[in-house]
Amino acid sequence: MIRKILLPVRGDGKGDNVFAHAATLAVRYKGHVVVAHCRPRAEDLMPYGIAISAPLRKLLLSQSANVADQVEDGMRKELESLAARFGITLSDKAIPGVATTAWIEEQGRQVDVIKRHGRLADLICVAKPDVDRNLGTNTLKAALFNTGRPVMMCPPLDSAPERLCDHVAIGWNGSVEASRAVAMTLGVLEEASEVTVLSTGAEVNGADSESLKEYLQARGVNVKLLRFKSSRKIGRDLLQHCAQVGADTLIMGAYSNSHETETVFGGATQYVVDHSGIPVILVH
């Protein structure tokens, strides 16, 4: 069951949408959303390789700190507004049976903040990377490769999702990553109204999709199996079949091949990351 959700934010304008997804889950599971803002150190904003006088350096440090204070204050107020909008209680700690949210502020690199807080989160919510603006890729990578926890990639939406984790699709290929994805999201699967296993039936040296269906049925999951013909564009096929069955969330193992290989040469995970229009829970 999802009890603690981490939401790393950085003032890039994507926080509201991701919070809408996290809030929807918090209300559904009575969970606690930790909104973690990574505040850059003023020293890191200094011009690199340029000699500046001590008075100018002091002035720049002061101005950087003031700007950071303004950003933090604005984001705190935005969180308060969003919490009220979604009916979530502001609380530094989780309250059993109540959807809550808290704000934390830390200095340093965002990857370190994600490591520290993500490793004890049931789910990490991040924005879908914006390739055109070069935003979000490092956040997704940090969450996937440095925490060992499930990561929900949230697509950009104009409003909160009407359904989330209600009809869940599983992209199954019998791999260790896929197995881990199922194991780490059992709480989601057991609470879903419907689960559809999507598979080509080509699980080489891995557990087959029929065995996964039986495994989930033994846990009381309402699950069905959909096999489709294998092609060289598995990522595209997964998304098409998600739309076909009406799934609102996809769960899959992430980057069975290396991230660099998939990014350069293409792969199922990278296609889904680039093209998905529904939330995707990824596990590496």
Which residues does each PLM region occupy?
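A short acidic, glycine-rich active-site loop
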Residues: R57-G74
